[in-house]
Amino acid sequence: MTCFSSATPHRHHLLLSSPSTSKSLLRFPSSYLKPSPSLLFHGSSRSLLSCSDGSNNRPPPSGDTVPNNFCIIEGSETVQDFVQMQLQEIQDNIRSRRNKIFLLMEEVRRLRVQQRIKSVKAINEDSELEATEMPEITSSIPFLPNVTPKTLKQLYSTSVALISGIIFFGGLIAPNLELKVGLGGTSYEDFIRSLHLPLQLSQVDPIVASFSGGAVGVISTLMLIEVNNVKQQEKKRCKYCLGTGYLPCARCSASGVCLSIDPITRPRATNQLMQVATTKRCLNCSGAGKVMCPTCLCTGMVTASEHDPRFDPFD
């Protein structure tokens, strides 16, 4: 086997040739291949490295040949030109980055498990844990914080209280106050009498009625918009973990500990007591009581899977 290497200031190309005249081109960054100064030509910036091995004529390794530190987009202002890449090289880069995405998601899952172990201090086994890891929903109402299941109930209570107060004020309090209209201090009833209109109209003040009806309509509309927003966000959540990203551990029944029972090897005629079973931390969930949801990969979103269209937009 004979191999030649031509070094450029940014990348090295290694050409492998075998007796079967099969050739393959591998790319390495400049830090992977440093030629000896004695091999450099004085009149050119390129270096030539040749080696021969007649006993080993194995084909070049097939698979992911992309270096770990290879990055097309290094920053917000630095983007390498990948138009010159060959088809096989593009496929290798896509496969490498897909694997990197799921490895990073697995790292996030393990970090969140450790965070849960160190942050939880006291757990009441009789009552269920609050969904603190439930992702917050952006509110559609301006100047309101993100919506959670707890704040949504508070929003319902506040809206019902406001609507009830407005109706009570417009229907009972305002008619008894004898609100005045105009500059002459004429009451609304006198104003109706002067126009020779039915006296039933004087029982309802149009100003109070319009303000009360408008306020009730605005509050009801905002509540309907918020409820619709919550329903739309719930459709985007994972159907298995309900947006938490975790499922109860089946090995320890979501308790975080499991029994450690060693096999008994004592003879039957012995008078020694049997060893009492002890508990230990569950190795499956690391004591957290929850494991990663395999459907959403700990993200809580229904589209986060291996077949996510964001990963393969042209398939």
From Swiss-Prot:
The name under which this protein is listed is: Protein ORANGE-LIKE, chloroplastic
* Subcellular locations according to the entry: Plastid, Chloroplast membrane
Q: What does this protein do?
A: May be associated with accumulation of carotenoids in chromoplasts.
Question: Does the record's keyword annotation contain Membrane?
Answer: yes
Q: Which gene encodes it?
A: ORLIKE
Q: Which family does it belong to?
A: Belongs to the orange-like family.
| Complexes and interactors | Interacts with PSY1.
Q: Any idea which residues the transit peptide spans?
A: 1-16
Q: Which GO terms describe its molecular function?
A: zinc ion binding
The answer, when asked if Zinc is one of the entry's keywords, is yes
Q: Name one GO biological process term.
A: positive regulation of carotenoid biosynthetic process
Q: Which UniProt keywords apply?
A: Chloroplast, Membrane, Metal-binding, Plastid, Repeat, Transit peptide, Transmembrane, Transmembrane helix, Zinc, Zinc-finger
Q: Where are the zinc fingers (CR-type)?
A: 225-307
Q: Which parts of the chain are CXXCXGXG motif repeats?
A: 238-245, 282-289
Q: Where are the CXXCXXXG motif repeats?
A: 249-256, 293-300
Q: Which GO terms describe its cellular component?
A: chloroplast membrane
Q: Taking the first listed entry, what is the main subcellular location of this protein, grouped into a coarse class?
A: plastid
Q: Where do the TM regions start and end?
A: 155-175, 207-227
